[in-house]
């Protein structure tokens, strides 16, 4: 979840590294550091600072350093607190080796203990520093650097990406990758290194993604690539256009606010894209037509917001194309009893395509030679490269940690895919698929209009009132329950207000004890008459206990509106698309609450955008 950026070449490194880190700060912002080799004597020059990247930039302004070979790091803490000592780079005893690292070294305690017995002195609590000390020892005991690296990689366990500078090899950088992304941008007599190619925007479109379990020795004009056992690997360079401009705020106060308003166009773009690949969709997602037609079970796997999108999509696949569908949290899926089924497909959902738990679940299913599909927003991601096939959401770059437009485009893509599968199975005709596409365009308009229907001053006034509460309860039934889960997560993520979500039918099985006037209860309504009446009954129970009720209702649902302290009314649309229609207003309301509380909305505490460690 940390950001790594490096440079080696004809120019000085600091400007590129700092610009790159600013683009990758979403990966972590507990501390930051920069190191380079002094062009005069090849000694390390470095600065580290706890807190946001701005603190490091300030230190570098006060104490300028630079060199032609340099690297930087923005950290999300997994081992050790946010402090100058724990910030990267980390060094060996003699400060001849510097390392920046993303991931987790699972056996770092054993390595540290062994090296301490041998006389090594450690200065941090990180799992990174032991790598530098171990490499120091191995270089001394091997005749070649390559042999030392192979020995190092045989000794460390976990998932990691590392960039390493060595004073005695001052014209190159060592890169190591195991189950954590790392790539090289190839320039003219210069090389750019990053954990996300977003850092390369405006510099190069020639990109080499390090294969899993590989290491590279990189000079300004040469790349030597090897597997962990020292066998040379081919250089598979891709041409990828990266546009950083779409990631700018463009006048909005926060990235999250911009991305909320991006959703209409993102859904429009999704429909245009999905229409364009409709005739070749099964090639795209790695299924044969025959397999798609005979599909008997679908499994959806994701984490966080992507898991909520999967929970919503379960209703699509079961009701539209009549395929039994299971949904699993990726972090739990790998440890469950598993029964492979051949006429099945596994869809892995991740905005970044780098989510560690989801990737490991994908690799587990790949190892069983079952059909895997990646649904992601990033075409250059690891999931795209490793799945049998993929489907790209058309959200555009999402910068805010709290997902907005990635969530809505995931729902749109899965809704369309369910209809396309139903067409393949002969359950619907092409006209019905086209109607579903039009329905998505309609709901995109509703999503945006629902925000405008509640003028900003009204929402701001309501946000000021609801920001005073310390906790909240969210309820839903059927397809509105997973949407309630997402709403509760959004409130927790960006406002830090404690929020708990339950299926409304479970209210009497414990949660009713939490109801009081100081705990607002949010209910997300449903179009089905039976489910709606059950929600009305839940609302009555809450009011009978002096609960404060906020309802997201549909036009004409007067009975539940009459019970509410606050109502948000949505137009009636296709029942399965109600959660998507409610998405924009829900996000905007929660955003305003967080703004009222003066929270760092784009970068909430303790969270990172791309969760690349388990």
Residue positions per predicted region:
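Conserved short alpha-helical segments that host acidic/polar catalytic motifs at enzyme active sites
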Residues: 1-249, 253, 265-296, 335, ...
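Glycine-rich phosphate-binding loops that contact phosphosugars or nucleotide phosphates
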Residues: 293-442, 477, 524-571, 589, ...
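Active-site phosphate/pyrophosphate-binding segments
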Residues: 263-299, 389-520, 531, 597-614
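Acidic/histidine-rich
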Residues: 159-190, 466-493, 529-531, 536
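Glycine-rich oxoanion-binding loops at beta->alpha junctions
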Residues: 68-85, 270-289, 313-349, 355, ...
